[in-house]
């Protein structure tokens, strides 16, 4: 059984490495509209017109242009709405980035901005601050979602949705079964992983649906 688990993990690792290489190659040859130089141009050619709201928190064209850069997506408006919504859920739950994370992410954007070699003026400083704001929202969104997954993993998750709770009970049963078997079943591990991802996604989506979201 251990041999099969080792083989499965080895194959999975190889697939991840290959997939990672493909992503790097893709990003190296990616559409130029997703490069920071071009996003800065798009940002400056965008306006502050409100294109959507999430619980009365506005999303402007300029914010959408930054989200397009952050996620390399054509569906930037929908992604901007999702990001804004998840950040609001994080705020409601009292989730915040650590001081270390804040400093690290700010340094990352400052370094990215410096590479653009833009003149030091008020307009460019506003662009820089918006870059930082959007990036911190993106990181908050990602880390908050990971926190939900960790709560499920450690069986500390709670929810008032009947269907999600049913899936959560199934998850706990599978996890305990996997643990009782010495954590050797790769098949059970895959089921547990997929179910955890599914529960976290459904839980967040259910809460997003309760927010007031409008597109203009």
What positions do the PLM features span?
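N-terminal targeting/tethering segments
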Residues: 32-138
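Short, low-structural-confidence N-terminal segments
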Residues: 1-74, 178-216
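Well-structured core secondary-structure elements of compact alpha/beta domains
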Residues: 61-82, 128-203
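Charged, solvent-exposed alpha-helical segments that act as regulatory interaction surfaces
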Residues: 118, 154-162, 209, 213
